Amino acid sequence: LTEEQKQEXREAFDLFDTDGSGTIDAKELKVXMXALGFEPKKEEIQKMISDIDKDGSGTIDFEEFLQMMTAKMGERDSREEIMKAFRLFDDDQTGKITFKNLKRVAKELGENLTDEEIQEMIDEADRDGDGEINEEEFFRIMKKTSLF
């Protein structure tokens, strides 16, 4: 993380840490989540804390918070990269990757794919059965194949 990103995370942490104890407990996390428009249940709050709480203290300290934020920022960056790739396929800007889009990209990359192979690729990623690949389907398949 850059110094600026660390500073942003420190400011966010300090906002959550309402009593200034240097840690975020379940009550503080619930208040902050509600302020952000979420309504997490008590179990969800406990799970969030246990997922982040590496030392088993039952609270989140700044180091643990920073590790979580670093991971989240990494996810955001890879999502942006995947969406850039999606837009390269979706050259007609329909919000979907069609058979025609995929065939064009394969040809540009010098891949000699048959129409059947292209259709198989679409079928593999197409979760809603509309015959095209939307952003979520593309994101999912890219994550699944670990290309990002």
From Swiss-Prot:
Binding positions (Ca(2+) 3): D126, D128, D130, E132, E137
Residue sites binding Ca(2+) 1 per the record: D17, D19, S21, T23, E28
Keywords tagged on the record: Calcium, Cell cycle, Cell division, Metal-binding, Mitosis, Repeat
Keyword Cell division: yes
Summary of the tissues where the protein is detected: Ubiquitous.
GO BP annotations listed: cell division
GO molecular function (one): calcium ion binding
GO cellular component, one term: myosin II complex
Pfam families from the UniProt entry: EF-hand_7
Parts forming coiled coils: none
Origin: domain of life: Eukaryota
Residue stretches making up the EF-hand domain: 4-39, 40-75, 77-112, 113-148
Ligand binding (Ca(2+) 2): D53, D55, S57, T59, E64
Family of this protein: Belongs to the centrin family.
PANTHER family, sorted: EF-HAND SUPERFAMILY PROTEIN, MYOSIN LIGHT CHAIN 1, 3
Function as written in the Swiss-Prot or TrEMBL entry: This calcium-binding protein is found in the basal body complexes (the functional homolog of the centrosome in animal cell). In mitotic cells it is specifically associated with the poles of the mitotic spindles at the sites of the duplicated basal body complexes.
UniProt protein name: Caltractin
Species assigned in the record: Spermatozopsis similis (Green alga)
